[in-house]
Regions:
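Catalytic core of membrane glycerolipid acyltransferases/transacylases, capturing the structured
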Residues: 1-41, 49
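Non-catalytic C-terminal accessory region of glycerolipid acyltransferases
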Residues: 45-150
């Protein structure tokens, strides 16, 4: 799947500080709409930055598990995305990704050549009538259903 350039300019990513550790990566993050968070010191500030981005009508890509899978299975979802969606009344567009673990297993630094990764954008989930927990569960359920995981 490709995202149009115009959409990408309005799209932000959420990344842990440990992944943006050197000056070059920090420079690239600033130039490419990456909101960097420090789990120990700046969590509240980074959530506020994401809220401001959403209030301006922009998009944020958040990986709800907060990390890569260690075994190829879907892990527990963090609630940050559900809180932002519910508090700001913005929809969530779940994305089902398959083949990423096979292409780059835990502990590897280079992907396997010619690996196929499928990305599927699912129907939006609207926060109305949901708690943070139920919103998170609906999103997870739709992704699992799309990936044919029981």
């Amino acid at each position: 799947s490709f995202i149009k350039r115009r959409t990408m300019r309005k799209t932000y990513f959420y990344a842990k500080k440990k992944h943006v550790s050197n000056r070059f990566l920090q420079f690239m993050a600033r130039r490419n709409n990456v909101i960097v968070m420090d789990l120990h010191n700046e969590l509240k500030e980074s959530i506020q930055k994401m809220a401001e981005v959403l209030k301006r009508g922009r998009n944020i890509i958040i990986f709800p598990e907060g990390t890569r899978t260690k075994d190829g299975m879907i892990g527990d979802f963090k609630k940050t995305f559900a809180i932002l969606s519910a508090e700001l009344n913005v929809p969530i567009v779940p994305v089902a990704i398959s083949g990423a673990f096979e292409a780059l297993p835990t502990g590897k630094h280079l992907p396997k050549l010619f690996s196929k990764i499928n990305v599927k954008f699912l129907q939006p989930v609207y926060p109305t009538g949901h708690t943070y927990e139920s919103l998170s569960e609906v999103v997870k359920s739709r992704i699992k259903h799309s990936l044919k995981i029981v």
